[in-house]
């Protein structure tokens, strides 16, 4: 028997079997039908608070679906760039919202009129073009402000970098009697520029913004500043620069320079010193600083207990 005949036989039998199945009907007396809704005006009333009323010029007070051309504000004009430059961000947002809302109203009226085959909508389009000009000028004003901010930030960064370079030179070359004064300045500098709190605590570490990209930059600056000062005063010290990223920079932030140099040498000798990937830096610093602080707290608590005894 061919494959075709098998398929035909199967199909025929399935139809036959389907026909011989008895039809089942439920008890129709148990089916309850809902009474038909009588057409009334109340059934077509729309809530006065319905959000789609925003697409009508007078909201829920609107009486007609499409305004006449004479009802449009044809004498209006678009906002000028000079006027918009004097507005705050909040005012620009309000103007943009009102402009967009009016454009939506006009668009609804034009689309509805065209679908009904109604007449000329040139006046509607003229008003819409004025609104489009206002929106374009708002975008231009916002772009001008963004560019101004970026230029100011770039200038400020240049000034900050110049100050940091100058402070580094003075710190490295300061006299012995000036070290304490420069150390206090460094504490203020790291807080003002890099946001590194001099009273860093375990509670502050729980805040996600405590250790950020700016903190990492400050850590690098402080570590290199301290090690260069130490090497200038102790040229016989055998220590190679540059430091290999946060892994070698952190000891100079947490300890005295001599202790930090010893720790970095141990890291290098053991092969544990490596350059971290960007995604590893902040979690590493947070965990390492937290571990160091907990260790200091434990040591401090132990010493207090010993003194009491």
From Swiss-Prot:
Highest taxon of source: Eukaryota
Keywords: Mitochondrion, Ribonucleoprotein, Ribosomal protein, Transit peptide
Subunit-structure text: Component of the mitochondrial large ribosomal subunit (mt-LSU).
Molecular functions (GO terms): structural constituent of ribosome
One record GO biological process: mitochondrial translation
Localization terms from the record: Mitochondrion
Major location category of this protein: mitochondrion
Family designation: Belongs to the universal ribosomal protein uL29 family.
Signal sequence residues: none
Task performed by this protein: Component of the mitochondrial ribosome (mitoribosome), a dedicated translation machinery responsible for the synthesis of mitochondrial genome-encoded proteins, including at least some of the essential transmembrane subunits of the mitochondrial respiratory chain. The mitoribosomes are attached to the mitochondrial inner membrane and translation products are cotranslationally integrated into the membrane.
Protein name: Large ribosomal subunit protein uL29m
GO cellular component, one term: mitochondrial large ribosomal subunit
Coiled coil regions in record: none
UniProt entry tagged with the keyword Transit peptide: yes
Record-linked InterPro entries: MRP-L47_sf, Ribosomal_uL29_mit
């Amino acid at each position: 028997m061919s494959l075709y005949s098998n398929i035909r036989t199967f199909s025929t039998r399935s139809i036959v079997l389907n026909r011989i199945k008895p039809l089942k009907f439920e008890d129709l007396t148990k089916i309850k039908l809902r009474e038909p809704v009588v057409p009334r005006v109340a059934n077509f009333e729309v809530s006065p608070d319905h959000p789609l009323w925003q697409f009508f010029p007078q909201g829920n007070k609107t009486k007609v679906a499409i305004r006449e051309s004479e009802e449009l504000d044809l004498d209006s004009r678009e906002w000028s760039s000079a006027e918009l430059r004097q507005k705050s961000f909040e005012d620009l947002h309000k103007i943009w919202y009102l402009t967009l809302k009016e454009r939506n109203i006009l668009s609804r009226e034009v689309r509805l009129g065209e679908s009904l085959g109604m007449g000329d909508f040139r006046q509607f389009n003229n008003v819409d073009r004025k609104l489009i000009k206002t929106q374009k000028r708002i975008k231009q004003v916002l772009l001008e402000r963004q560019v101004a901010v970026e230029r100011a930030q770039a200038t400020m960064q240049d000034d900050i970098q110049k100050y940091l370079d100058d402070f580094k030179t003075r710190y490295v070359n300061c006299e012995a009697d000036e070290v304490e004064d420069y150390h206090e300045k460094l504490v203020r500098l790291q807080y003002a520029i890099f946001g590194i709190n001099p009273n860093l605590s375990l509670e502050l570490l729980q805040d996600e913004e405590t250790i950020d990209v700016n903190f990492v930059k400050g850590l690098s600056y402080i570590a290199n500043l301290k090690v260069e000062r130490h090497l200038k005063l102790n040229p016989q010290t055998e220590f190679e620069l540059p430091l290999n990223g946060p892994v070698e920079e952190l000891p100079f932030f947490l300890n005295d320079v001599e202790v930090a140099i010893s720790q970095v040498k141990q890291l290098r000798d053991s092969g544990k010193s490596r350059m971290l990937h960007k995604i590893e830096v902040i979690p590493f610093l947070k965990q390492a600083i937290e571990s160091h602080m907990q260790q200091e707290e434990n040591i401090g608590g132990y010493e207090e207990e010993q003194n009491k005894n």
